[in-house]
Amino acid sequence: MALAPELSRQTKLKEVAGIPLQAPTVDNWSQIQTFKAKPDDLLICTYPKSGTTWIQEIVDMIEQNGDVEKCQRTIIQHRHPFIEWARPPQPSGVDKANAMPAPRILRTHLPTQLLPPSFWTNNCKFLYVARNAKDCMVSYYHFYRMSQVLPDPGTWNEYFETFINGKVSWGSWFDHVKGWWEIRDRYQILFLFYEDMKRDPKREIQKVMQFMGKNLDEEVVDKIVLETSFEKMKENPMTNRSTVPKSVLDQSISPFMRKGTVGDWKNHFTVAQNDRFDEIYKQKMGGTSLNFCMEL
């Protein structure tokens, strides 16, 4: 599949209300903002590289009552429409969501202020997963390297500056996570931490199950824990993005499912970068009650 010139590696991000986004998304913004959510929609919300595919597979396994075969019905990106996704002439995320029967499970990377207003007015359920900023930064760097529809990230040192300044696609990690955290009690939001999911997947999966209004036997929950492990998902063609053309995601540069660990940032950050990041983190996150685990 050849990429149109405007989707070449040199693609520049555009902005909506100061938030950098991929150009086709911005060009399709009016359709995204007027999207009509339904009261029984469940929206999976994450900052990029925070366990989106993982939580999607968990939610789908719960929805399908642990039936692995049903979860193999199609690739994961087709099961839960990505509402801000746009790649003309293909159907947009909104088009795919509109064609889906209720109840719908959808996904987004949008910060709270850019979410289509109908999600709030319909009091939808939101499932948010947050990952510590350092690991998120590293994982996003490798994704930027292999993604052929994002700008070239440059060197790690260059990308470090881009990330801390919020100039990556979907904007600042700090603002994104804080935004969702601050409204968690005002709406139907289940706020989970990637690190908790790694530490005790069964407990966190049970939280998701209860949030979805499902009641599955313990043996089914144990099966879901096994089937949604990183090792299983990395080998699963329905979740590992191996079907995505190399012209979009070049997994010879870096695999889509790379490590899935906590603390990999220590293999990338210099001492000086870590000290600087900690200082910036204190400034930006000092006023919140958010606490992240940086290593297990």
Swiss-Prot record:
This protein's GO CC annotations: cytoplasm; lysosome; mitochondrion
UniProt-annotated catalytic positions: 109 (proton acceptor)
One BP annotation, GO: sulfation
Transmembrane segments: none
Domain of life: Eukaryota
InterPro entries documented for this protein: P-loop_NTPase, Sulfotransferase_dom
GO molecular function list: aryl sulfotransferase activity; cholesterol sulfotransferase activity
Residue numbers binding 3'-phosphoadenylyl sulfate: 49-54, 131, 139, 194, 228-233, 256-260
Modified residues (Phosphoserine): 139, 254
Protein's name according to its UniProt entry: Sulfotransferase 1C2
Source organism: Rattus norvegicus (Rat)
Gene designation: Sult1c2
